């Protein structure tokens, strides 16, 4: 993430022979690797030769710059004018709308507020009044008296980010404003550090929300079983190694975050997000694990059927059936790999997408085709690579990773699973599911 990592941290990653999934994501976010995980030597050389205690910044055009920390421990932000006088952060001062506004302007939200509101108005016109939605006055809204309304001003006063987004859209809607409990604040004093931290927390939380929706399929729930947060969310966005999902829920909303219409995140262009976050969202879109399996599998030995030594109608028929099955499996793998850089095609397979294929066991059948395309040696080599690279998500899925039998030998149950049979799945059907002809 721009402005978060020290050169020394990245240099340590670059010195490793094998990087973890989280470390690879960091290198991609900084432009040191391509989305296909290929190194960018010129930028790596820049980092290798930079001062170890410098902070790495990524400009909008992707170029790198390095800022050495000042003696006070603060770093100069790109574009900050020397000698510019600002309200000092970390002190208390008598409340005034003007000073609050000054602090807010220095810490604005990283996402375009107008675009958020436009998308919400277009795609979420009617929040359903069911047991699964917001109750009256469930969303707590705080705002400073006399301060112009914006999502950033709501954040500064302690409103949570998802609540601020909803309020910005539905505050004037008689159909929806029943869900808000609005409190106008006019304190005697303002803690400038707390105000700024509120906005920064909102910024981090909205970035995490995008990652969770795109990468895990939705937002966490306060009432559901605790689910793990990715290393990217914990360490790259929040810089909190032990951050839990229930803690993130508190940062996101005063209500249950799972009630928020998460599909709206798929409608907001990722170009409005910081590069490192948009890159992370595009890296691992929920609903596309078969594509990630295919990208890995293509590196290993493919299966081939030897021509039978004894030719007769029975052996010839069996040979042709097996050959056609393997050839179709290979073509399916090729199609999946060809879509690996097609972001829009992958979004169609997201669990929240209305365009997602309704075919039963579709992902399971794709996985079976991927495993079928490999020789037994190829499957074992892929299994070994999954272990060496510590791809935990793949290890948890025995359909791609396999399992050990009673003799300790790797087997792949997906190949004998009737639900995984892809004989009725055509290559054209796979293309159509991803919006391709």
From Swiss-Prot:
Keywords carried by this UniProt record: Capsid protein, Helical capsid protein, Host cytoplasm, Ribonucleoprotein, RNA-binding, Viral nucleoprotein, Virion
Q: What is its main location?
A: virion
Q: What Pfam families does the entry give?
A: Nucleocap_ssRNA (PF11128)
Report a single Gene Ontology molecular function.
RNA binding
- UniProt entry tagged with the keyword Ribonucleoprotein: yes
List the InterPro entries.
Nucleocap_ssRNA
Ribonucleoprotein is among the record's keywords: yes
Q: What domain of life does the native source organism fall in?
A: Viruses
CC annotations in GO? helical viral capsid; host cell cytoplasm; ribonucleoprotein complex; viral nucleocapsid
Tell where it localizes.
Virion; Host cytoplasm
Function noted in UniProt: Encapsidates the genome, protecting it from nucleases. The encapsidated genomic RNA is termed the nucleocapsid (NC) and serves as template for viral transcription and replication.
| Subunit organization | Homomultimerizes to form the nucleocapsid. Binds to viral genomic RNA.
Give the family, as the similarity comment puts it: Belongs to the ophiovirus nucleocapsid family.
Q: Give the protein name, as stated in the record.
A: Nucleoprotein
Q: Give the classification, highest ranks.
A: Viruses, Riboviria, Orthornavirae, Negarnaviricota, Haploviricotina
